[in-house]
């Protein structure tokens, strides 16, 4: 396939390797990285068990990345999975693939947008919890939280409409800020009086007999595809690369490794830094 674009053909090639890496990492690390350590990772696998599970999940994702890289080099155009399916299996399969992708992304966007309300509720409750509307399963919904989600969606839409160059730079700033903040949080945790290596015991969850639970580790491995979802944004933007598509594999692998590292760091901090009155992460 001819990979050259001229005039008005194709999309603008303005995404650098750093922009693409930031796009993938920013898609991988969402609200789940901050919520799941306490309600999924630690209860199921423990600190060390989570590390093992996320490492296994990262290896699985790298295998998938190898397949993506192969397809990107053969079909270096926008569309990702839809393009690959349509070209390989025909329009019927392509149509089905496009609909499933559309439904999945339609679910992810409001999921992450409304996660801002959860953050605002815990950090700035007086700013967002106004205008009570209704309750769902005992969870109150406020107009202020909905407004926060709408503002975030509009902001990102504006950056996207402005063009891929602006969106790429904005995403890069956000991703680098995210990585920097997590590492600063880790450094602060090391010097916190509430942090101790002894808090990481037990390293694994145990079953009724007191033995380490392999099932718990496998349970975390099972959610790895969800935890790492996002690096698949790279093949979808492949037509906008301003570099060789052969670099896509390295970028995908780096985004997966960074994503896995951030998950493990946040999970370890959650277990090691305990509030007053607690001596272990075990609930």
Feature-to-residue mapping (PLM):
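The first (N-terminal) embedded transmembrane alpha-helix
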Residues: 17-36
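Membrane-water interface regions at transmembrane-helix termini and the short interhelical loops
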Residues: 11, 70-72, 96-97, 151-177, ...
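Short amphipathic alpha-helical coupling elements at transmembrane boundaries
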Residues: 73, 77-87, 94, 169-172, ...
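Lipid-exposed faces of alpha-helical membrane segments in multi-pass integral membrane proteins
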Residues: 25, 29, 52, 56-60, ...
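Extracellular loop-to-transmembrane helix junctions
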Residues: 12, 33-139, 255-261, 265
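Helix-loop-helix junctions that connect adjacent transmembrane segments
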Residues: 6-12, 50-51, 127-144, 172-283
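Residue-level signal for alpha-helical transmembrane segments in multi-pass membrane proteins
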Residues: 63, 67, 107, 111, ...
């Amino acid at each position: 396939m001819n990979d050259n674009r001229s005039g008005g053909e194709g999309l603008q090639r303005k995404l650098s390797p750093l922009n693409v890496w930031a796009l993938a990492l920013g898609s991988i690390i969402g609200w789940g990285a901050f919520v799941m350590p306490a309600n999924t990772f630690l209860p199921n696998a423990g600190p060390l068990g989570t590390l093992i599970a996320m490492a296994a999940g990262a290896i699985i994702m790298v295998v998938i990345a190898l397949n993506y890289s192969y397809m990107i080099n053969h079909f270096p155009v926008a569309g990702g999975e839809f393009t690959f399916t349509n070209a390989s299996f025909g329009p019927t399969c392509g149509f089905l693939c496009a609909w499933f992708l559309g439904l999945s992304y339609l679910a992810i966007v409001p999921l992450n947008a409304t996660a801002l309300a959860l953050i605002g509720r815990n950090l700035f409750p007086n700013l967002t919890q106004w205008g009570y509307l209704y309750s769902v399963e005992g969870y109150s919904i406020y107009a202020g939280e909905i407004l926060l989600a709408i503002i975030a969606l509009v902001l990102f839409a504006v950056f996207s409409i402005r063009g891929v160059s602006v969106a790429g730079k904005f995403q890069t700033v956000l991703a680098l800020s995210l990585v920097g903040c997590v590492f600063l949080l880790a450094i602060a945790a090391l010097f916190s009086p509430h942090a101790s290596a002894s808090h990481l015991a037990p390293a694994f969850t145990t079953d009724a007999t007191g033995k380490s639970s392999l099932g718990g580790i496998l349970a975390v491995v099972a959610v790895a595809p969800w935890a790492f979802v996002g690096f698949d944004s790279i093949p979808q933007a492949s037509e906008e690369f301003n570099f060789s598509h052969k670099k896509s594999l390295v970028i995908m692998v780096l985004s997966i490794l960074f994503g896995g590292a951030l998950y493990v760091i946040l999970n370890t901090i959650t277990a090691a830094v305990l509030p007053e009155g607690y001596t272990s992460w075990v609930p």
